[in-house]
Amino acid sequence: MSSPTRWEIFWRTVMGRAYPRVVGMQRERSWLFFDTVLPLLQVSAFVFIYRAIQAPPEFTGFVVLGGAMTAYWLNVLWSMASQFYWEKETGNLELYIIAPTSLMAILLGMAIGGMVATTVRALAVITLGLLIFRVEVSIVNVPQLLGVFLLTLLALYGRQAQHLSNLLQEPVFLVSGFYFPVRALGFIAALGASVIPITLGLDAMRQLLFPTMMAQFRFVDVRIELGALAVLSIGFLWLAKRALSYMEDLSRREGRLTIRGQ
C-alpha cells in the first residue's frame, strides 16, 4: 500500500479540522438560537436609532448588512486568532506542532469549518433583518458582489493574533463602519481603516446593494476595492505563513509548546 502524498495529507488535515466545527454546530442546537436570534437585538437597537432620527431607509440596510458581517469578524478573533493560545493552555498545541502535516492545513480547515458555521448565522441575520425591517435592496452586479464577499473572507481569515482579540474587537466595529458608511469618518480615516479587509468589503457590498444612497457616501470605486481586497488577501496569507513558521521555530527552540507547570 502506497503512502499518501503531501497534498493528500494536506487536504485530509483540512477536512479533519473543518469537520468538528460544522458537525458541532448541528449537534448543539442551542448555538443556532444564540447565534441567530440574539445578534438581532444589537442590530435592532441601531435600526431604531436610525428610525428615531428619521434617517433614510437605506441606513436600515446598512445596519443589517453590518450585523451579518459582525459574525465573521468575531469568528476570526475568537475561533481563529486565539485558537492556538487556547490549544496551548489545554496541552494540544504540542500535538499540532509535531504532527506530520502543515500548520497552514490545520488553520485552513479551521477557517473553512468556521466559515460554514458562521455563514448560517450571517444568512439568518440578513434574512430575518430583511423580513422584519422590510429592507429593500437593489443588486447592481451579482458577480462583483460575490467577489467582494469571498475576497473579504479570504483576507479576514488570513489574519492571526493572540491577546490582541480583546483590544481589536470594539475599535474595529467603529473604524470599519459596521453600522454606518465608513466615509462618514472622513477620507483619511477611511483610508487608514482600509488595512482591515472588512472595511473595504462592507463599503463595496453596500455600493452594490444600495447604489442610490451610497452614491453620496461611497469611499472609492468598487473595482478599486476589489483590487485592494485581492492584494490584502495575498498579503495576509503570506504574513500568516511567516507568523506560523516563526511560532513553530520559536516554540521548538525555546520550549514554549506548553504552559509552565503543565
Question: Where do the PLM segments sit?
Answer:
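Hydrophobic transmembrane alpha-helices and immediately adjacent juxtamembrane helices
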Residues: 1-262
